[in-house]
């Protein structure tokens, strides 16, 4: 029994904070190099970070722990960092097929991979094989509606329709918040509730980017009304986000009155 618990703990710890952060940074860097639209970038992040990595942990038997049908491939055994970087590019490829009329070509992804994947050059055939493995691992779960960015974009559109204050809210700040949360291992759980995260990110971005003297719109009550989440639930996530996106000294002295929004 103790051995089983040890195996489960070891599996749940994979890939580890530093390795996961490097992989997310790799995908973000690739997104910049490819000049992806935000919806493609965040769909790829959702596919890779929220679906592939947890599914690999369950399926591939790290430290002997398996869950569901095993997936076998030379890309998974051994599972090198270069192979995981290939899967990150495959996530981008799949996302572009969903959202773009002219998806990224495998040749363009291979060319980028040759420049930014260390220690390994993958062929176009490898990319095609990796796509099949990716789909098997995530069990073809590539729906793109239930992601935080989609909800965030919808909320911001609604906000701007009912208040001019919405024009002061910077979407770049919203996206920077999502990037930081993706890079941080201990905040990745927030993406398990994408709609709640989107609502909380909007409130956080409002507090950060809208001048305090313009805090005339009741953003928190409006968000809770629109999403049906309790104010307390939203504020807990907002404070969690602020702890990650602001430096500790910027958080000092911020009581609830500072977030009376």
UniProtKB/Swiss-Prot annotation:
Pfam families hit by this protein:
Cyclin_N
- Reply yes or no: does the keyword Cell cycle apply: yes
GO biological process terms, semicolon-separated: cell division; G1/S transition of mitotic cell cycle
UniProtKB keywords: Cell cycle, Cell division, Cyclin
**Which first-to-last residue range defines the signal peptide?**
none
Tagged with keyword Phosphoprotein = no
Q: Name one GO cellular component term.
A: cytoplasm
Which terms in the Gene Ontology molecular function aspect does this entry carry?
Answer: cyclin-dependent protein serine/threonine kinase regulator activity
**Can you tell me which family this protein belongs to?**
Belongs to the cyclin family.
Name of the protein this chain belongs to: Cyclin-J18-like
């Amino acid at each position: 029994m103790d051995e089983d618990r040890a195996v489960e703990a070891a599996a749940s710890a994979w890939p580890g904070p530093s390795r996961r952060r490097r992989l997310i940074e790799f995908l973000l860097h690739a997104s910049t190099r490819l000049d992806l639209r935000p919806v493609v970038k965040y769909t790829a992040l959702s596919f890779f970070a929220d679906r592939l990595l947890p599914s690999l942990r369950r399926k591939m038997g790290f430290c002997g722990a398996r869950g569901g049908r095993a997936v076998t491939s030379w890309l998974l055994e051994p599972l090198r960092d270069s192979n995981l970087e290939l899967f990150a590019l495959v996530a981008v490829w799949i996302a572009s097929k969903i959202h773009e009329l002219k998806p990224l070509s495998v040749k363009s992804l291979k060319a980028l991979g040759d420049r930014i994947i260390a220690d390994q050059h993958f062929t176009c055939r490898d990319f095609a094989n990796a796509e099949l493995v990716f789909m098997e691992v995530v069990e073809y779960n590539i729906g793109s509606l239930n992601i935080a960015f989609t909800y965030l974009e919808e909320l911001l559109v609604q906000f701007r329709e009912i208040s001019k204050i919405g024009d002061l809210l910077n979407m770049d700040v919203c996206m920077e918040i999502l990037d930081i949360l993706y890079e941080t291992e201990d905040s990745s759980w927030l993406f398990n509730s994408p709609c709640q995260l989107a609502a909380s990110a909007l409130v956080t971005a409002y507090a950060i980017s809208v001048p305090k003297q313009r805090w005339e719109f009741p953003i928190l009550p409006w968000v809770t009304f629109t999403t049906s989440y309790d104010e307390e639930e939203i504020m807990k996530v907002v404070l969690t986000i602020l702890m990650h996106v602001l430096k500790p000294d910027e958080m000092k002295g911020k009581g609830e009155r500072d977030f009376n929004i």
